[in-house]
Amino acid sequence: MVSPGLDLELSFSQAMQGFGLSPEVARLLWLPLPMLLVLVAAVVGVLVSVWLERKISAAVQQRVGPEYAGALGVLQPLADGLKLLVKEDIIPARADSILFTLGPILVVVPVIVSWLIIPFGQNLLISNVGVGIFLWIAFSSVQPIGLLMSGYASNNKYSLLGGLRAAAQSISYEIPLALAVLAIVMMSNSLSTVDIVNQQTGAGILSWNIWRQPVGFLIFWICALAECERLPFDLPEAEEELVAGYQTEYAGMKFALFYLAGYINLVLSAVLVSVLYLGGWGFPIPVEWLADWLHQPIDAPVVQVITGSVGIMMTILKAYLLVFIAILLRWTTPRVRIDQLLDLGWKFLLPLALVNLLVTAALKLAFPVAFGG
């Protein structure tokens, strides 16, 4: 657990100066680290998630799965990407070519931009803005426009139905998701993702928001799965009903963009759950214990470098545990009907999220120390 009063960037600089580097060189070495980490995490996250999807689905269906492209098939996602890259880019004769091309871009760009506010460590993020969570909700609201645009521009009835379903589903689940996040913001007194994690670093695992917001956690996770269009909520691209939904007429790299956006969004949602409810980079034990074991002061560079590195691994570990659960759900649960999907969002999750928000406000007034008063 990194103490909120300590600066990982400063500790890194001090550690580099201990090796004889000047402060300016240490600063230059630090600058690319947050951006590099985010880019690597997004790309590797997609590759690992696709590989996990293939292997877990094979295990559920008692198959071997990918095994020839690298050891245990780890290079299969790269092979899939190269295959889509070299395929012909086809635009249907009667499709609106401009909207047809713009649709996938509007779907994938907001997801990638959302990684700007994701913290992997105390200062390991690209943009620590004060309204980080608000920005993420705003970016995610752009996606339904791209999905509806893709379905409409394809000039295909299955694509149009898929686009309409995607837009309806996204709008239905964005509201309870935002209300669940608002309860966390209320307890943290901040919209910054860094502040939200720091608020969970008082007593190790017992400080995590999941214990104070179990209902909000379930609401957020269900809504996140619906936003990612994962089973049992993959109505927009239900193969048995709509061929491939809004993706029906797409091929090559345009289809790959939808594929990419889906998996980046899945990993992003898992990391956000880790940040909002599972303590983010926080380690389950207090940092003081590690400092005592190393016989170092709590603000020693070596202590902060170790806790920072472990914190990054903790964030990724928590996120991939949730990715594993999402993949397992896809291959073990049946798809719901569209009316059941909308009823769950509007008639159950939305009222439950409102009640959870009101209860959180009451608890904040009654127990200000425990609930961030």
Swiss-Prot record:
Catalytic reactions on record: a plastoquinone + NADH + (n+1) H(+)(in) = a plastoquinol + NAD(+) + n H(+)(out); a plastoquinone + NADPH + (n+1) H(+)(in) = a plastoquinol + NADP(+) + n H(+)(out)
Primary role: NDH-1 shuttles electrons from an unknown electron donor, via FMN and iron-sulfur (Fe-S) centers, to quinones in the respiratory and/or the photosynthetic chain. The immediate electron acceptor for the enzyme in this species is believed to be plastoquinone. Couples the redox reaction to proton translocation, and thus conserves the redox energy in a proton gradient.
Subunit-level organization: NDH-1 is composed of at least 11 different subunits.
Transmembrane segments: 28-48, 98-118, 129-149, 167-187, 205-225, 267-287, 309-329, 348-368
E.C. number(s) listed in UniProt: 7.1.1.-
Cysteines joined through disulfide linkages: none
Name the record gives this protein: NAD(P)H-quinone oxidoreductase subunit 1
Keywords: Membrane, NAD, NADP, Plastoquinone, Quinone, Thylakoid, Translocase, Transmembrane, Transmembrane helix
Listed GO biological process terms: aerobic respiration; photosynthesis, light reaction
Taxon lineage: Bacteria, Bacillati, Cyanobacteriota, Cyanophyceae, Synechococcales
GO MF, any single term: quinone binding
Coiled coil: none
Localization per Swiss-Prot or TrEMBL: Cellular thylakoid membrane
Highest taxon of source: Bacteria
Main localisation: membrane
Pfam family, one: NADHdh
UniProt xrefs under InterPro entries: NADH_UbQ_OxRdtase_su1/FPO, NADH_UbQ_OxRdtase_su1_CS
Membrane topology: Multi-pass membrane protein
GO cellular component term, pick one: plasma membrane-derived thylakoid membrane
